[in-house]
Amino acid sequence: MPKLGMQPIRRRQLIQATLETIDDVGLADATIARIAKRAGVSAGIISHYFGGKDGLLESAMRQILWDLGDAVARRRAQGVESPREHIRAIIDGNFDRSQVNKTVMKTWLAFWSVSMHRPDLQRLQRVNDRWLYSNLCHHFRRCLPRPEAQQAARGLAAMIDGLWLRGALAPQGIDVDRARQLAYDYVEEQLARSTSHAPTDA
C-alpha cells in the first residue's frame, strides 16, 4: 500500500503509468525507471511511496478491484431488486469497460502470474474470488436450496473468469456482448430450477 501523504491525483497518475507500461513492454520490462518516465516523476518518488515495483503493482491491482466493485455498485444503484437483477449486475460489472480494456486485461494477466509466487498478492486474489462467489451465492440462495445455490455460484464464477480469460487471450479481443449473454443464459438455466425447488432456510 502507498504511504500516506501522496495526493490521490498523483497516485492515480502513477498507477495509470504502471498499467500503460505493462501494456507496452510487459511486467518483466516495466521497470521503475520506465514507469517514472511515463508518469513524469522521479524513480525516487515511486520507491518512497510504494516501496518499488511490487508495491506499485499491488496498488494498481487494488485500484482495478476497487473499479470492479464500483462498476457493480453503480449497476445495483439503478434500482435492482430481484436475484436475477443482482446477479446480472455482478456479471455486467465484471465485463465493465474498466475491466475489459486492453491495458487492464494485460495487468490482470500479469497479476495472476506473479500472485502464484507472492503470498500478499495471493491474498488479494483470494479476497476477490471470495467476494465474487459469496455475492453470487447469496443471490442464488434466494431462489435455490443451499447446495444448488453454491454449485450455481461456483459455476458462474468459473464461467465469468473463463469468458474473461478467453477474451483477454483472443487476438481480436473480448466480445463483451457475447460473453455477457453466455453468462446470462447460464443464470437462466440455474434459476429455472427455482420453479420446482424452494430455499430450505434463510
Swiss-Prot record:
GO biological process: glycine betaine biosynthetic process from choline; negative regulation of DNA-templated transcription
Keywords: DNA-binding, Repressor, Transcription, Transcription regulation
Coiled-coil residue spans: none
Gene3D superfamilies: Tetracycline Repressor, domain 2 (1.10.357.10)
Record-annotated HTH tetR-type domain positions: 8-68
Keyword presence, Transcription regulation: yes
Family matches, as PROSITE patterns: HTH_TETR_1 (PS01081), HTH_TETR_2 (PS50977)
One of the record's GO molecular function terms: DNA-binding transcription factor activity
DNA-binding annotation, residue ranges on this chain: 31-50
Pfam family, one: TetR_N
UniProt pathway annotation: Amine and polyamine biosynthesis; betaine biosynthesis via choline pathway [regulation]
NCBIfam families given in the database record: betaine_BetI, PRK00767.1
Protein role: Repressor involved in the biosynthesis of the osmoprotectant glycine betaine. It represses transcription of the choline transporter BetT and the genes of BetAB involved in the synthesis of glycine betaine.
Designated name of the protein: HTH-type transcriptional regulator BetI 1
Organism expressing this protein natively: Chromohalobacter salexigens (strain ATCC BAA-138 / DSM 3043 / CIP 106854 / NCIMB 13768 / 1H11)
Lineage of the organism: Bacteria, Pseudomonadati, Pseudomonadota, Gammaproteobacteria, Oceanospirillales
